[in-house]
Amino acid sequence: MLSGAQLRVWRKQERIERVRRETTAALAHELKTPLSVLSATAELLGDNLAPEKQAHYLGVIQQQAQRMDGSVRHMLELSRLETGAKALRRTAFSLAELAQERLQAALPADSTIRTEFAAQDKFEVNADRALLARALDALLENAVQHTPEGGCITVHLADGVLSVTNTGDAIPADALPRLWEAYYQADPSRSAKGDGLGLSIAKTVFDLHGFTCGAENTEIGPKFWFRFADK
């Protein structure tokens, strides 16, 4: 009969092993395509190509290398969060100010996407600022990826809830509950940008803080939200 302490240790070890297996399988899956592209492109560079063609294929190699680097970093980050290897470092700060800061940094200078920000208060929270910034970045990156040019992304804080809403197509109802799962994509064609880890990382950060989160469709487009305080 295991004691309470032994059972907790066993469960933690089981969780770490599960995450290790899932991360290994995910790495093999996610790196297969970019590695194939790198191999094929490297073979083409071995041919006698014009300088402009060489520059093009070198750009492809750089792009795929960056994709692999991002996927590996995101998977390792998610693994550390899920296994508890990364502890929370709580400090007091204004969530409204952090959200406005991340919104301003979310778009490239030449983007035609508009942004709107509204907050009832500064909303002081005691949380891990760096991790919440990462979670907010994930919500905003997702919004940017699915907002058409000329569209709008709105960040709103009220009644203990922060929401990110973007103009664009509605999310299929059967996909809404699964959006926070690692590697899940509502578009089975995988034409969407990203590696499918951002929202999962965000949810893990929210879970660590004891926050709830969700996604829904609105009249103007999808909305992702998390509750950080009672009303």
Where is each model-derived feature located?
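Short acidic helix/loop segment immediately C-terminal to the autophosphorylated histidine
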Residues: 46-52
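Short helix-loop "hinge" at the ATP-lid/N-box region of the Bergerat-fold HATPase_c
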Residues: 143-144
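Short conserved segment of the HATPase_c
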Residues: 171-185
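Conserved glycine-rich
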Residues: 210-211, 215
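Conserved micro-motifs of the catalytic ATP-binding
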Residues: 83-88, 124-127
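Short alpha-helical segment of the dimerization/phosphotransfer core of two-component systems
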Residues: 63-68
